[in-house]
């Protein structure tokens, strides 16, 4: 795992996600679910490794929409604990570079990659997605799920994604945007304070992406469908394995997100864009 010192401005983001004991919490949850932590599979991690709305369902759909193939060089921009990168490597056979600004997430992602036998397919680096340590045209696909909400400078975020994409490259997004009402009910999964959340409307996001050099190939507002699924799931008893295993107050954060969507304070957008 390569370490790149995060910028000072990333401190609020790191504080939102890092607890200092994520690996221990995951090991405890795996053991409680009857798993042998010395012999885990990608299937064992399915319920706890995708830190975004709809979890594995959203990841599968986005990979399919982006038409990721084995020969593609893929960047998982904002990998969290690496669930998306592992699914792409395991299901598509692609080589994946995974970056996140939170060092603890990268440490846990590297551990889990090695644990399920995918360490040789995924290169994890601590890096800022607005200042990527890669040459131009290094990737064929950039995947980013629930990342830009923490980033104020979205022009720089997407300009960097455009810079590292080769001609014909694709940007695949599953993200939260602002709705027509405000403010947000907090906490939500990406923010406990207003200073940590930087939402823009879908229309503004399309404008920013266009200014960065992208054209929309697919754009779908899945807000209500996703909110219905999340409401039904999180109103029931929670399994031993889940994001609540290592994300403090996770159920409260998710139900606030559902409420924000219902009141049009937030929306969920699935998109694939092409390089212009």
Predicted regions located by residue number:
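Conserved Class I S-adenosyl-L-methionine
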Residues: 218-276
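A short acidic, Gly/Pro-enriched loop at the edge of an enzyme's catalytic core
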Residues: 130-141
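A short SAM/SAH-binding and catalytic strip from SAM-dependent methyltransferases
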Residues: 141-153
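N-terminal auxiliary segments of SAM/dcSAM-dependent transferases
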Residues: 1-32
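A short glycine-rich, Lys/Arg-flanked "PGG" loop and its adjoining helix->strand segment in the class I
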Residues: 155-170
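Conserved alpha-helix/loop element of class I SAM-dependent methyltransferases that forms part
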Residues: 52-70
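Class I SAM-dependent methyltransferase SAM/SAH-binding core
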Residues: 73-77, 81-131
């Amino acid at each position: 795992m390569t370490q790149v010192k995060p910028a000072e401005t990333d401190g609020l983001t790191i504080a939102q996600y890092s607890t200092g004991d994520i690996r221990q919490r995951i090991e405890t949850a795996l053991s409680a679910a009857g798993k042998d932590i010395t012999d885990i599979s990608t299937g064992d991690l399915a319920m706890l490794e995708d830190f975004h709305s709809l979890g594995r369902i959203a990841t599968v759909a986005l990979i399919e929409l982006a038409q990721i193939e084995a020969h593609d060089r893929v960047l998982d921009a904002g990998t969290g604990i690496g669930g998306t990168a592992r699914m792409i490597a395991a299901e598509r056979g692609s080589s994946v570079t995974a970056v996140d600004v939170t060092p603890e997430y990268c440490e846990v992602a590297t551990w889990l990659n090695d644990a399920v036998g995918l360490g040789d397919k995924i290169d994890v680096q601590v890096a800022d997605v607005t200042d990527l340590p890669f040459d131009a045209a290094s990737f064929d696909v950039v995947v980013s799920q629930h990342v830009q909400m923490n980033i104020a400078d979205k022009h720089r975020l997407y300009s960097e994604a455009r810079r590292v994409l080769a001609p014909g490259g694709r940007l695949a997004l599953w993200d939260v945007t602002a709705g027509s009402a405000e403010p947000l009910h907090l906490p939500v999964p990406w923010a406990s304070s207003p200073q940590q959340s930087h939402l823009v409307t879908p229309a503004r996001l399309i404008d920013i992406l266009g200014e960065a050099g992208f054209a929309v190939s697919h754009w779908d507002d899945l807000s209500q469908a996703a909110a219905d699924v999340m409401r039904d799931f999180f109103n029931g008893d929670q399994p031993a394995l889940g994001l609540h295993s290592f994300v403090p107050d996770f159920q409260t954060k998710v139900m606030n997100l559902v409420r924000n969507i219902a009141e049009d304070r937030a929306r969920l957008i699935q998109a694939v864009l092409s390089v212009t």
